[in-house]
Amino acid sequence: MHDSVLERVTLRRSLGAKYLTTPAPSKEDYAEALTWAIAAPDHCHLSPARFVVIEEREKFADFFEAGALADGADQEGAQRARSKALKAPAMVAVVAKIDEHNERVPTYEQWMTVGAATSNFLAALELKGFAGKIVSGSSTHYRDAVDALCKKCEVIACWIMLGTAKPDAPGAEVLSLI
């Protein structure tokens, strides 16, 4: 492995939306990242992770707002939830299908595969010059978002907020040394 690749991946840090700017990854960038994601360890080749690029951001902002209101948020809280779907230049959903009845592959192994695939996905995008952060919490359970993305027996494991790191992002001084 090239030392520069290893160094770049080990210097990767999560960067929230306020530290991200355009450009966002292209379809080609996502395709390459997916090849890394599917290379994750996967006992019995269950492929428990799917990555969905969210192109209809306003629609998902509506889902986040409605979900927050359904969870009891006031109008200000609902607007904060809404803004989370729009802040980063790009948003990807990690959808997991965990087979709880699989006798050969326990659920914890399947979740480890989802995590490894997500890590590989992020590492590939990092090597292409992008940055991002995994976000979970209540937004992964908002009914409209789940209904829009998930098939039977699937859940939203997390969201990945992506873009290009701003020059003043934490760790930018380290990345500039590469």
Task: Label each residue range with its predicted role.
Residues 87-90, 130, 153-156:
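Short coil/turn connectors at secondary-structure junctions
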Residues 56-58, 97-98, 164-167:
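Short loop segments at secondary-structure junctions
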Residues 1-17, 152-178:
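C-terminal helix-cap and adjacent tail motif
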Residues 1-88:
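N-terminal amphipathic, basic helical "cap/leader" segment at the start of enzyme domains
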Residues 37, 92, 98-146:
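Small-aliphatic-rich amphipathic alpha-helix that forms the alpha element of a beta-alpha
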Residues 146-152:
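Short proline/glycine-enriched turn/loop segments at secondary-structure junctions
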Residues 46-49, 127, 131, 157:
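Short secondary-structure junction motifs
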